[in-house]
Amino acid sequence: MPINFSDEERLATLRLIRSARVGTNTFWTLLRLYGTAQRALEALPGMARRGGATKYEVCSLAAAETEWKELRRLGGRFLFWKDADFPSYLKGMSDRPPVLATLGNAFALESFTSRVVLAIVGARNASLNGQKFAASLAEELGKRKFLIVSGLARGIDAEAHRGSLKTGTCAILAGGVDIVYPPENTLLYEQIKKEGVLLSEMPLGQAPQSSLFPKRNRVIAGISIGVIVIEAALRSGSLITANFALEYGREIFAVPGSPFDPRCRGTNALLKKGATLVENVEDVVQAFDLFSAPVAQTTTPAENVPLEPVSDDLVKKARMQMLSLLSAAPTKVDALIEAMPYPISAVLTALVELEVAGQISYTTGQCVYLNAQAFSEE
């Protein structure tokens, strides 16, 4: 257990990320403002009221303890961002999940700190050749000591998991770690739970929803040293994963396909933009021999040290200006901070107050937008 990270702070961390309208960006902002999850929890109801909410309750201690005990009953555990075995590459993400629920083989989980992690993603409606290639490539990469990560979707994801079951595989889930989706992959889910590892940042029992898949995709990209895309349409979740990988400085690989197959237009587009072409396992291995692999960060991008406190009046002014500057179109948080003549503590506090009150929301990334019910303060 890391120093200065007690069981009480772990439960507070779980409660904070499970509280209403507290996403990963808001979680890390709260840590910067208050230093610990416990202090942030104490401040949250007041922040919601100042943001315009008439009622706000944080996740209760009983609810967090119930989820904790249920995960242990299932044979799993929570991984917290300060834990030594928290996946190394995730530590460098500004929007990394602070808590991951895990189920599966303890040895496979330990592999995240000792093996090179590669993601393989692709089309759900993949061709037979694409599926066979995914399974074969995953198997060969596993023999070369790579740990294979994917999203347990039908098609390419499922075959990548099947190919790497014997050598080490990890499924990142869009719903709770106890929820099998799609149902047709129930047997594969059970096999991974026995031989590999299942990870999710979502609460137990959370059913997958369309809005949760991009969040899942960012974890797939962030947890890996590189992403291999096999068959992907121009508008697909696989390309979302690739875009996150580019943002995080990961290597991008793509398998070429027929120009007449819509399932290959996304991968061919990645190749045009400079992705490494993959026809066999040697193409992947040689790429890491030629290029320096990104170094996994062992420190967090923004340390959880409290920022300088500012007056309520200054925060109110920042909140009012923020409501006038934002719209339904997403705005980069960095651009918003730069446009406002207030200390960063005031701007960050205003951001949290408005989000937990339901007036603004974050996209999967570093953008915010105004919700329909938002109002301007008088």
What are these regions (language model features)?
Residues M1-D7, F80-E378:
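Glycine-biased, small-residue-rich flexible motifs in mid-sequence functional cores and linkers
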Residues M1-D85, A357-Q366, L370-E378:
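Short, small/acidic-rich helices and loops at N termini and domain boundaries
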